[in-house]
Amino acid sequence: MKTKTLRRLFSMLAALVMGLSLLTGCNEKNAERTQEQEDAQTIQVYLWSTSLYENYAPYVQSQLPDVNIEFIVGNNDLDFYKFLQQNGGLPDIITCCRFSLHDAAPLKDSLMNLAMTNEAGAVYNTYLNSFKNEDGSVNWLPVCADAHGFVVNRSLFEQYDIPLPTDYASFVAACQAFEKVGIRGFTSDYTYDYTCMETLQGLSAAELTTTAGRKWRTTYSDPASTARVGLDDTVWPGAFERMEQFIQDTHLTADDLALNYDDVTGMFRNGEVAMYFGSSAGVKMFQDEGIDTIFLPFFSQNGEPWIMTTPYFQVALNRDLEQDTARREKAMKVLNVMLSEQAQNRIVSEGQDILSYSQNVPLRLTEYLKDVRSVVEENHMYIRIASNDFFAVSKDVVSKMIAGELTAEQAYQAFNAQLLADEEPADNETVLTSGKAYSNVFHANGGSAAFSVMANTLRGVYGTDVLLATANSFTGSVLQADYNQKMAASMIMPNGLMSRQRTMTGAELKETVHAFVEGCEGGFVPFNRGSLPVVSGIAVEVKENNGSYTLTGITRNGQPLGDNDTVTVTCLATEKQMEALLASDSGTSVGEDTWVKNTWRDYISGGATLAEPENYMTLR
């Protein structure tokens, strides 16, 4: 009798175990299906700067409430996207500011051809030509321009009765007149590669946009060619002659090579220099300080005025979108909004003008650019050649010209030789290996696995009980790959992410998590599920209601967080966000604030391992 009873019990137990196993398996399959559905419904947009995350991204999402857009702050570096491409992590939509077709060539076959889209058709041909591949395809489109030219202290001109420049000859005459009264007519921050590069090109914008100039640029940028391309002998020799003449006319010397932005703007503010090369944003800055400031273009020696422009960013779409009609349609909707006038208004700094390359965006100039209206209306907005080679070689060669070490002919030869030289092999020593790729799509049941890997790893690095991070802290690039130093460093958001450590009570931690999840006055407010924070050492429950979020629960080690618990907490955010999120009286300070990028770089240099992800958030 006892034996029969035991057998029945064993049978019932076995059936129960089997039932639980089947139920668990079903739940796991259901969870996988849900995550796959979330993946398919999500359009990922990588932003080149966190500044776009705060104003631009929320607007784009607000215009497309039926599209789940996940914005991630990536890197302003095409090498970063090449790495993602090589390891299966290229996002749906890419933005990059430091850009050239030359450097983007390896990505061409992975990007959609936008040539026949309405978005490409709206770009003025003058500018679209700079983005055409030799086969006529177009993978990248520019948004609005950042205008660079001469920031001019008009009050100094009036004080010394010196006429404002209207052409190159009068520009030189003004420089000479100021020198007679002990004031520099012109200088700029030639310690930077971009100032060297843009001066060289800006002085010859008229020539570089001729038929011969465009032909050379197309050849230089051709993604189908693997051969290195040097300078031509038609347009470029004259460019170095004009640079040499400019150096002589403005009396630039080796001393100017040490000047940075703060040095130059300080000289301008103090009336020590009348003109410098810079962005139109400088006009508003100095006008707000009470200095009568205007913006003037480059005066070409052939008489044409030109503005040097760089798109705030270029945008491209992943070709894989063409395999799914529904996802492609969603991505095109996102692109359309990203390029709209209203969205572009949220890219520029306060008071700056929108100089759009698109015919769909009307020209509305403020007082800060009214002096160059005719230049803009004539489409004399030159888009710089901005390959990595051009940045580096311009810095080297133009600096030597300013120092008096190279003549125009020598500079041309040196520049050409460096462009043609074989690339030095990159430092590909592996500092970090990830044996598994983790999804960086936010899932309602768990959060983002890739972000969780980063948060859990950094919690161990900082030796803290809890880590809280704004969603823009990580680039989401936890791939199954070997990482060199540069790519490992790029796993952290590049724009000034800092850490602050506190010892807190449970009540103080609840208040802090509340600010991260729901937003706070003067700080960042999450605008979609992908912008919710990342946490480690705790798990949170959040309620979603038409784009707003409410914290409903916090657990630690599986138990509700107690108000009297004591925990060490590390918070990650930009400096501006940190001040709003974590007031000085929130807990007790533990050490000084540090830059996360530096901490991460030190960690990976010492032989890093990545932590496993955890389900850190449940969104209901």
What are these regions (language model features)?
Residues 20, 26-101, 164, 410, ...:
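Conserved N-terminal structural module of periplasmic/extracytoplasmic solute-binding proteins
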Residues 62-126, 155-166, 266-267, 274-275, ...:
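Extracytoplasmic "Venus flytrap"/periplasmic binding protein-like
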Residues 97-148, 163, 172, 198-199, ...:
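Hinge/lid segment of periplasmic solute-binding proteins
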Residues 139, 172-228:
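Extracytoplasmic/periplasmic solute-binding protein
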Residues 218-257:
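Glycine-centered hinge/linker elements that transmit conformational signals in sensory
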Residues 287-350:
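Extracytoplasmic/periplasmic substrate-recognition and gating elements
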Residues 296, 346-400:
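Long, aromatic- and glycine/proline-rich binding clefts that accommodate carbohydrate-like moieties
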Residues 427-620:
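Catalytic centers of hydrolytic enzymes
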